[in-house]
Regions:
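Generic low-complexity, intrinsically disordered sequence content enriched
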Residues: 12, 33, 71-75
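Intrinsic disorder/low-complexity signal
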Residues: 2-3, 13, 38, 76, ...
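A short, structured beta-strand/loop element
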Residues: 24-55
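Negatively charged, low-complexity tracts enriched in Asp/Glu with abundant Ser/Thr
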Residues: 1-20
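Active-site scaffold segments
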Residues: 56-60
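Mixed-charge, Lys/Arg-enriched low-complexity segments
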Residues: 61-85
């Protein structure tokens, strides 16, 4: 199987597809040497092409499961923290 990538979504764009922040975040499924990952990474625009930065994280299934559990177990605390002024 060749290395491949599938874009799941982007964070930091308006409804017209224009970036609202300097380095938007892309969420992608990717594979490398028959291993599958989810990649959450900041991107920058270079000559009208989005390119990845080193700022991000690549997770395998076990790591993603652990992250999702942490987020789900703490969703109330996270929402409260982010809502406080």
């Amino acid at each position: 199987m060749p290395d491949e990538s599938k874009n799941l979504g982007k964070i930091g764009f308006d409804n017209n597809g224009e970036p609202k922040i300097r380095e938007p975040i892309f969420v992608k499924l990717s594979s490398y040497r028959n291993a599958k990952f989810i990649d959450i990474r900041k991107y920058y625009e270079d000559n009208e092409e989005w390119k990845p930065t080193k700022k991000g994280v690549t997770l395998n299934k076990e790591q993603l499961d652990e992250l999702l559990k942490i987020l789900n177990d703490n969703v109330n605390d996270i929402n409260k923290w982010l809502s406080e002024e």
